[in-house]
Amino acid sequence: MKFFIDTASLEEIQAAKDLGMLDGVTTNPSLIARIVGDASSFSYQDFREHIRRIAEIADGPVSAEVTTTDAEEMIHEGEALAAIHENVVVKCPLTIDGLKAIRHLSEKGIRTNATLVFSPNQALLAAKAGASYVSPFVGRLDDISTEGMALVEQIITIYDNYGYLTEVIVASIRHPRHVVESAMMGADIATIPFSVIRQLANHPLTDAGLKKFMEDAAILKKESDA
């Protein structure tokens, strides 16, 4: 399973790359606004430049989201985003207009990511429209007492049944269990916040064992110095 990092932070992207855990990046306007702080001084050209800088760090796909809801405007913006860097994938919301944009962009050879997907119906439409990727938001479904990972399993089954080439990006990941369940189900990709990537490496028994090893190593060192 591939690991994408879900962030717009250049520092986090570089850190994930240094760990060998970076197969791609997903961003959205909210993530970019979070790192910018004062959005009033951040122009659309600044946004494009930030996407370019992300793509220069990442060796894989970088999903950049359109900022409009009209099909024609999404197509126009998507073409401009794709021109920033060869790694850019255009994220479009799963709406009727979004499907139109996905179809048009896909037919032009531009990779697309159908985002804000919350049902198997939407995922089926994304694949039919030619989306390169589909992003089911599991954490947000969990938030409303719906089993988000059940949706991932449904999508994988549908795609396997018909041989769709659309890759499943498990998104809105909140904790390591989401990542492990994604891997067990056979999802293509999990897009993970950097904080969760760090959590994947943690286990209390590892900490306890390491503490004991270090204590014993210190004793051995004292004995060898004696």
Curated annotation (Swiss-Prot):
<dbReference type="GO" id="GO:0004801">
    <property type="term" value="F:transaldolase activity"/>
</dbReference>
<dbReference type="GO" id="GO:0005975">
    <property type="term" value="P:carbohydrate metabolic process"/>
</dbReference>
<dbReference type="InterPro" id="IPR022999">
    <property type="entry name" value="Transaldolase_3B"/>
</dbReference>
<feature type="active site" description="Schiff-base intermediate with substrate">
    <location>
        <position position="91"/>
    </location>
</feature>
<dbReference type="InterPro" id="IPR013785">
    <property type="entry name" value="Aldolase_TIM"/>
</dbReference>
<keyword id="KW-0704">Schiff base</keyword>
<keyword id="KW-0570">Pentose shunt</keyword>
<keyword id="KW-0808">Transferase</keyword>
<comment type="similarity">
    <text>Belongs to the transaldolase family. Type 3B subfamily.</text>
</comment>
<dbReference type="InterPro" id="IPR004731">
    <property type="entry name" value="Transaldolase_3B/F6P_aldolase"/>
</dbReference>
<dbReference type="InterPro" id="IPR018225">
    <property type="entry name" value="Transaldolase_AS"/>
</dbReference>
<dbReference type="GO" id="GO:0016832">
    <property type="term" value="F:aldehyde-lyase activity"/>
</dbReference>
<dbReference type="GO" id="GO:0005737">
    <property type="term" value="C:cytoplasm"/>
</dbReference>
<dbReference type="GO" id="GO:0006098">
    <property type="term" value="P:pentose-phosphate shunt"/>
</dbReference>
<comment type="function">
    <text>Transaldolase is important for the balance of metabolites in the pentose-phosphate pathway.</text>
</comment>
<dbReference type="Pfam" id="PF00923">
    <property type="entry name" value="TAL_FSA"/>
</dbReference>
<protein>
    <recommendedName>
        <fullName>Probable transaldolase</fullName>
        <ecNumber>2.2.1.2</ecNumber>
    </recommendedName>
</protein>
<dbReference type="InterPro" id="IPR001585">
    <property type="entry name" value="TAL/FSA"/>
</dbReference>
<keyword id="KW-0963">Cytoplasm</keyword>
<dbReference type="InterPro" id="IPR033919">
    <property type="entry name" value="TSA/FSA_arc/bac"/>
</dbReference>
<comment type="pathway">
    <text>Carbohydrate degradation; pentose phosphate pathway; D-glyceraldehyde 3-phosphate and beta-D-fructose 6-phosphate from D-ribose 5-phosphate and D-xylulose 5-phosphate (non-oxidative stage): step 2/3.</text>
</comment>
